[in-house]
Design a protein with these regions (language model features):
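Extracytosolic ligand-binding ectodomains
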Residues: 1-190
Length: 190
């Protein structure tokens, strides 16, 4: 989609970055997207100019930044400062206010995945997760202050909801501590 036929990758030089590269390269191949490069950077780097110049020379339609947190702002800002006009994609690891603060206007137009709690108020009323997402946001912000919600707490909330539904169903099938209970729990009690 979006007329993206070539992508370059710029990710952390650690297991996180490598994991994203490994998965993304498989998906790109399956989708007939040409990978024109694969660059790495360290979380503590203060410059990625060399990597960005290689990316610009390859002229990709898009760049996927395989990073998380505020360190992922560095390549985004460098790409924009050097004139990259293509689409930039980030991972779910940047779905937080600290990243937005550090990246500033250079983040505008970036695509990234996120759970619904970060956009709960913007979801249509008939969205099946709007009520649960708003419930989480309201409870979290009541305890921690307005604007404090993050995607990461939402993932734990989701896990809690799954357990709240799976445990009663598993208890109907087996006793806690047994192999049967673990099996029932792992299949949401079905």
């Amino acid at each position: 989609g979006n007329n993206i036929k070539t992508v370059d990758y710029l990710g952390f030089s650690d297991a996180y970055g490598e994991g994203w590269w490994n998965e993304f390269s498989k998906i790109a191949e399956a989708r007939k997207i040409q990978l024109v490069g694969s660059e790495r950077f360290n979380r503590t780097d203060t410059s990625v100019t060399g990597q960005v110049l290689k990316i610009l020379a390859a002229k990709p339609d898009a760049v996927l930044i395989g990073g998380a947190g505020t360190p992922a702002a560095l390549p985004q800002k460098a790409l924009k400062e050097k004139g990259f006009k293509g689409q930039i994609y980030q991972t779910h690891g940047v779905a937080n206010n600290d990243f937005l603060r550090v990246c500033g206007k250079d983040c505008e137009g970036t695509f990234l995945p996120s759970g619904p709690m970060l956009v709960a108020a913007q979801l249509p009323n008939d969205n099946p997760v709007k009520k649960s997402a708003n419930d989480y946001v309201n409870k979290y912000e009541a305890a921690n202050g307005k604007g404090s919600v993050s995607a990461f707490g939402g993932y734990a909330w989701d896990a809690g909801l799954l357990l709240a539904n799976a445990v009663p169903a598993a208890l109907k099938k087996a006793q806690p501590g047994t192999k049967e209970f673990r099996k029932a729990l792992g299949s949401s009690g079905k």
